Amino acid sequence: MSLHYQTGFGNACATEALPGALPAGRNSPQICPYGLYAEQLSGTAFTAPRAENRRSWLYRIRPGVQHLPFAPFAGAQRWLSDFGRQPVTPNQLRWSPLPMPDAPTDFIDGMHTWGGNGGPEEQSGVGIHLYAANRSMQGRFFYNADGEMLIVPQQGRLRLATELGLIDIEPYEIAVVPRGVRLRVELLDDVARGYVLENFGTAMRLPELGPIGSNCLANARDFQIPVAWYEDVEGDFELIAKFTGGFWRAPITHSPLNVVAWHGTHAPYKYDLRNFNTVGSISYDHPDPSIFTVLTSPSDTPGTANMDFAIFPPRILAMENTFRPPWFHRNIASEFMGLIHGVYDAKAEGFAPGGASLHNCMSGHGPDADTFEKASHADTSQAHYIRDTMAFMFETRRVIRPTAQALASPQRQDDYYQCWQGLQKHFDPEQA
């Protein structure tokens, strides 16, 4: 089944699965075409500036309110939103990939929270999760009232069956599901593994380009939004809600994926990271990693993001007389990294696809000893092609608080610090 999409980041879209299902000239007619119900889904305040306002009108077979009462849900045991107030270690942390589950596990029950900050009630901060699943969601649907979800597959393809249409993603692609959108996650392969950033703050947008100009980085035209699709199915289902960090379950006698037409700006979307237009130095020095930003969630402080999503894709390094890998760094922001494919150019060993690392505020990090030695003696008169890689970073203004399950995980590499212990002292006061 080949899916079709609309294009353009943040566009006001209009789509219908049946001809004439979208009302003409108004949002809420007295009687909707085909006997549908009109329902508005608001992702921002009514009075948010027009350029930032996100809402969609949905025309559905049954309204979203039609389900039985919610009760606490006992699943999703490893998906957390309470990051506690206990002291956080300043040590650099790294993990090997999650193993695939043995028991039948879907996207919801296969989520493992590795860290986060802030929270849904203050509508600021993030949750950072890894998932490993071996079956599709069956007989259940899910929505997240706490934040939008940025899904980064590392292994296995996913189909996101959402209220607003179908999205297929594979490794090298990402998808964003806005706050409140109901969906079912289906596996298109036997197993699936990847990363999820849960953004409690302002919805993600494209970063400003400044002197770069009107093009480059992630171009708006390359983002894809689903077309209307619906299923008219009745049965005994459950609707799972994530609300203020807790999980709730409501019985529902029909599929909530019953939107026949919709228009607006609050919609899921996908993006192929291979379309990222990378920029960099063509003279000397390695620019700041902000040039690799794909999406950003602004905070109330200008120039300081609630979170940034950046990637380190295949690229050409042409800087002369320059240490080309990412330099040693201590940062006021906190950095969580993952690897989708290949090798990260600052770490020769130990950082595997599906793995993760955390370098919190002011914790030193940088290339390992082997990478430093090789890059220090490389011939920089020749361009260097980095082909076999796709790494990414979730960067936040707040300290990322690792969860107890992340710290106790058998995937944690307790010897991570050793990768820097081989760095030699080269200082010689007699020779500049």
UniProtKB/Swiss-Prot annotation:
Pathway: Amino-acid degradation; L-phenylalanine degradation; acetoacetate and fumarate from L-phenylalanine: step 4/6. The active site is at H286. Fe cation binds at H329, E335, H365. One of its GO terms (cellular component) is cytoplasm. Belongs to the homogentisate dioxygenase family. The gene is hmgA. SUPFAM superfamilies: RmlC-like cupins. One of its GO terms (biological process) is L-phenylalanine catabolic process. Its EC number is 1.13.11.5. CDD domains: cupin_HGO_N. It catalyses: homogentisate + O2 = 4-maleylacetoacetate + H(+). Its cofactor is Fe cation. One of its GO terms (molecular function) is iron ion binding. This is Homogentisate 1,2-dioxygenase. Hexamer; dimer of trimers. The keyword Hydrolase does not apply. Involved in the catabolism of homogentisate (2,5-dihydroxyphenylacetate or 2,5-OH-PhAc), a central intermediate in the degradation of phenylalanine and tyrosine. Catalyzes the oxidative ring cleavage of the aromatic ring of homogentisate to yield maleylacetoacetate. It comes from Bordetella pertussis (strain Tohama I / ATCC BAA-589 / NCTC 13251). The keyword Oxidoreductase applies. Keywords: Dioxygenase, Iron, Metal-binding, Oxidoreductase, Phenylalanine catabolism, Tyrosine catabolism. Homogentisate binds at Y344, H365. Pfam families: HgmA_C, HgmA_N.
